[in-house]
Amino acid sequence: MIKSIALERAAGNEFVPAEGNVGCEGLTPSEMILYAAGKAVGNDIIALLGSVAGRVMSLRITVEGSVVTRGKERSGTYREFLFRYDVVCSDPDDHSRISRAIELAHGKYCALVRMLKMIGPVAYDIYIHSGKDGKVGKEKETVTAN
């Protein structure tokens, strides 16, 4: 079974559940783990971007966790995780800096991502679009780290 939560960057660089997701009060404890990890890594990415963060028009983080259950159990144990980053920026020259900030957040700075890596593999996909409509230029990168 796959559990998933999506967050979007809002005013004040706050990460909130994306449209269609319930607020935090409606999340199960296991979904709260995904929410907390997405919010923590998002905060680290914004901090690492510095002045470039102002040129990021939107940042959506989707965190998925594969849950393994045994028998008739209602809850299970996470076995692996996938983070998906959908970024729209105003300047195509910022693509490499954005990718690097995501790499650093996953590989070095985010304590919650490091915690998830103790549970199982953590992979991430990066989709970066530039232009006002988000359709000019597109990069995809998939990284799996343990």
Region locations from a protein language model:
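Extended beta-strand/beta-hairpin segments
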Residues: 1-36, 43-146
